[in-house]
A protein has these predicted regions:
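Membrane-proximal alpha-helical anchors
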Residues: 1-44
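An amphipathic alpha-helical interaction surface
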Residues: 42-124
Length: 124
């Protein structure tokens, strides 16, 4: 069952990675890296993409809570949160959409953001 959970997570990551390679998403990522303003359409596209990314992370959180995700995989996910939230746009989107997530996931994400802001990106 654990192997199946891990495979499902890997499949989900692969789908998100492929979605992140689509032209419209790549264009938005480039604009974000260059600190360029996004159009309303680009904001909408990226909001959807980032929301899906967080839903996948919420699923990982759930899998960990029920014992289906091992500690190594969980630790990797927590570290990746710190990288994910280095992008100011991600923080902006999170503040906007976090009310749509489970309370314990919101607490987890907010704590990871707080830790990375206090201790820097290398804290785990």
């Amino acid at each position: 069952a654990r192997a199946n959970a891990r495979q499902n997570i890997a499949d989900s990551h692969q789908k998100l990675a492929l979605a992140g390679m689509k032209k419209d998403i790549v264009a938005v990522k480039i604009k974000l890296r260059n600190n360029e303003e996004l159009s309303k359409e680009e904001n909408s596209i990226y909001l959807t993409y980032f929301s899906l990314m967080l839903r996948a992370r919420e699923n990982q959180h759930y899998q960990h809570k029920i014992g289906m995700l091992d500690e190594d995989e969980w630790s990797s996910m927590l570290i990746s949160f710190k990288t994910l939230f280095k992008e100011p746009k991600h923080l902006e989107i999170w503040e906007y959409i976090k009310i749509t997530f489970s309370e314990d996931f919101v607490e987890l994400v907010d704590e990871q953001i707080r830790q990375s802001q206090i201790y820097g990106q290398d804290s785990a």
